[in-house]
């Protein structure tokens, strides 16, 4: 696939890649018309939060470069980096900007965090509500509501969980819009790989946001003490000797995972063991469907559940009760728990 037109036009985020290619073939005296002025960034503090060194460096580079796909691992504080960038751009100014999300839950969580950071004139737009503001947090599904106020006016475009925006007509159209956004920043823990067989996802993101900037790896942050070192235990579950040939994958999953008493009892025993060893333990269990939630809830004491039918406020109310429970507790959720949800415990 070609990423430039017959007359040489290309997405501006690909400029650094194209310049590099030109240099590799010996091109010299490359001229760059209308090159943006380089301004030394000022980074103000936000709320009561203190930046780690790599977070402050990431904010500096985002502001200096104006475009970046920020590659930062889960737990590294991407949302604080986002808030720091916006706070810096609001210093002595009142810019218009949009932060796009795919998930309402992450939007709500980010909105509350940005308020704690002191982000000014903050707005909110999703299927569950609308609050006007110059810095508008919006789901891509509800973007039509802010077209008139933010499409041409926005000087800032940010995208959270950016790997979710490199496929699909609606999401790609969204990140390729906002023509006057001179600051274009995308944040993800899993950017599409450079050497992937399907390079299109990477090129779509780079075209809209520029090259990848890596903060620190998860391994680095574990060594620094910023992230806890995970302990992974693989629990043996003796496989069945044979499976009927006429069963579909879903039939097999229901029979040998969701409704398997031996397997579910083993999960119950593990939870009970943790409860006995730590009277304040907090356990998270992720499953794929509602029936599995019910099967485990019947077995596990002091158990909270989150399902897709729960609205955003209900989900956070349940999480808050779970975190503040003064006894050992378990929370079981489906895929609504699997992206970007922050649980302090």
Protein language model features and the residues they cover:
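Pre-Walker A (Motif I) flank of P-loop NTPase domains
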Residues: 64-70, 95, 279-281, 328-329
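Conserved helicase ATPase core of P-loop NTP-dependent helicases/translocases
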Residues: 108, 120-132, 282-286, 294-295, ...
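Conserved helix/coil segment N-terminal to the catalytic DExD/H
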Residues: 126-156, 166-174
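Conserved Walker A/P-loop ATP-binding site and its immediately adjacent core
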Residues: 76-116, 193, 288-293
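Conserved pre-motif I regulatory segment
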Residues: 2-5, 21, 30-71
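Post-DEXD/H (motif II) to motif III coupling segment of the RecA-like Helicase ATP-binding lobe
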Residues: 163-233
């Amino acid at each position: 696939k070609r990423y430039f037109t017959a007359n040489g036009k290309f997405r501006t985020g690909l400029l650094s890649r194209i310049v590099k290619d030109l240099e590799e073939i010996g091109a010299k005296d490359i001229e760059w018309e209308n090159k943006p002025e380089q301004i030394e960034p000022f980074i103000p503090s936000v709320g009561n939060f203190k930046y780690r060194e790599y977070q402050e460096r990431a904010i500096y580079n985002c502001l200096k470069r104006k475009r970046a796909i920020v590659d930062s691992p889960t737990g590294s504080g991407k949302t604080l980096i986002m808030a720091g960038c916006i706070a810096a751009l609001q210093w002595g100014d009142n810019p218009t900007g949009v932060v796009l999300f795919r998930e309402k839950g992450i939007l709500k969580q980010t909105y509350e965090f940005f308020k704690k950071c002191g982000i000014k004139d903050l707005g909110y737009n999703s299927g569950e509500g609308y609050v006007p503001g110059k810095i508008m947090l919006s789901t891509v599904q509800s973007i039509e509501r802010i077209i008139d106020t933010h499409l041409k006016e926005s000087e800032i475009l940010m995208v959270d969980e950016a790997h979710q925006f490199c496929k699909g007509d609606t999401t790609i159209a969204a990140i390729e819009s906002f023509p006057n956004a001179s600051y274009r920043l995308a944040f993800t823990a899993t950017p599409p790989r450079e050497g992937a067989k399907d390079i299109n996802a990477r090129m779509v993101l780079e075209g809209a946001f520029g090259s990848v900037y890596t903060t620190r790896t998860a391994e680095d942050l574990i060594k620094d003490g910023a992230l806890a070192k995970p302990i992974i235990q693989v629990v043996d579950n003796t496989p069945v000797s044979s499976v009927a040939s006429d069963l579909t994958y879903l039939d097999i999953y229901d029979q040998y995972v969701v409704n398997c008493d031996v397997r579910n009892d083993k999960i119950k025993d593990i939870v009970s063991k943790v409860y006995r060893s730590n009277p304040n333990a907090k356990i998270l269990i992720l499953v794929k469907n509602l029936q599995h939630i019910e099967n485990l809830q019947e077995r596990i004491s002091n158990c909270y559940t989150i399902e897709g039918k729960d609205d955003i406020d209900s989900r956070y109310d349940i999480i808050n009760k779970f975190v503040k429970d003064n006894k050992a507790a378990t929370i079981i959720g489906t895929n609504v728990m699997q992206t970007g949800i922050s649980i302090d415990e």
